[in-house]
């Protein structure tokens, strides 16, 4: 193995991996036909492939197991064809628990090469945990939509738990003014729910139980108030790609789209738009923001 991060390389060596000092040394140390499996960020894949491919021979195999855009897979596969290097895209799901549970593998590439690699896929995945989804790009296309769905599920849990967290609104001191719709029947909202306990009970036999909910419950167990988090949610690209595919296919995907937009909102990207809204309300009706002078 080779990693540009000395810390990551040291950890892998301690687990029994054999290390190489450079990409050239890595490729040279492999038995023929050589197989190199990449696990790098999407932005680094092209440069990494160019480096590795310069040392590979016809008949060698290059597997991208990261979260690449499937359109890039189509291009890379064509670029490697003149060198007769086989390219396989593998969407890998399982997160940090994959080492214990096995990884879900969504595979794209030539049938004969995927068949040749089956012993590796079988070793990495749980039973029935890998699938040859189709030709080049198919694996990462399926993984892209998988991650889009993940965004939607996560948003649904977060919104539902937020409703529960706010179910004691009648106990809060809120001013009465012309700019805020009054809460009718405040006595209907006097519940102090224990969110960590609710996530725990939902895990057990509930229709909405899932591994994501298990992880949510674990997070609340470690930090019931989630004080370690500011709520600025990143997005690594797959959600955006899923929405683009939905638009190109003219397929409605309102839940997945809203979940991506909410991540933008969490990072303050709607602040200017909200100021514009407040300014318009003030101009047409003299409406001031709550707390403003």
Predicted feature residues:
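Residue-level recognition of alpha-helix initiation/capping sites
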Residues: 3-4, 71, 155, 237
């Amino acid at each position: 193995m080779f990693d540009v991060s000395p810390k990551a390389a040291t950890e892998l060596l301690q687990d029994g991996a054999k290390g190489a000092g450079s990409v050239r040394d890595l490729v040279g140390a492999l038995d023929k036909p050589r197989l190199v499996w990449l696990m790098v960020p999407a932005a680094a894949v092209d440069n990494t492939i160019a480096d590795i491919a310069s040392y590979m021979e016809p008949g060698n195999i290059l597997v991208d197991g990261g979260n690449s855009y499937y359109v890039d897979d189509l291009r890379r596969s064509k670029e490697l064809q003149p060198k007769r290097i086989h390219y396989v895209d593998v969407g890998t799901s399982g997160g940090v628990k994959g080492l214990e549970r096995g990884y879900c593998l969504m595979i794209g590439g030539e049938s004969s090469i995927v068949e040749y690699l089956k012993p590796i896929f079988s070793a990495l995945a749980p039973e029935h945990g890998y699938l040859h989804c189709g030709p080049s790009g198919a694996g990462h296309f399926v993984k892209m939509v998988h991650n889009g769905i993940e965004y939607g599920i996560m948003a649904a849990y977060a919104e539902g738990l937020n409703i529960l967290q706010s179910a004691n609104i009648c106990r809060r001191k809120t001013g009465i003014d012309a700019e805020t719709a009054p809460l009718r029947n405040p006595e209907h909202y006097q519940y102090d729910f224990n969110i960590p306990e609710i996530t725990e009970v939902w895990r057990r036999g509930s229709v909405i139980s899932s591994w994501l909910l298990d992880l949510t419950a674990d997070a609340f167990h470690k930090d019931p108030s989630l004080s370690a988090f500011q709520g600025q949610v990143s997005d690594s690209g797959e959600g955006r790609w899923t929405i683009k595919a939905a638009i190109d296919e003219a397929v409605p995907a309102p839940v997945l789209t809203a979940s991506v937009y909410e991540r933008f909102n969490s990072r303050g990207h709607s602040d200017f738009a909200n100021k514009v809204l407040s300014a318009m309300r003030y101009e047409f009706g003299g409406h001031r923001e709550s707390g403003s002078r």
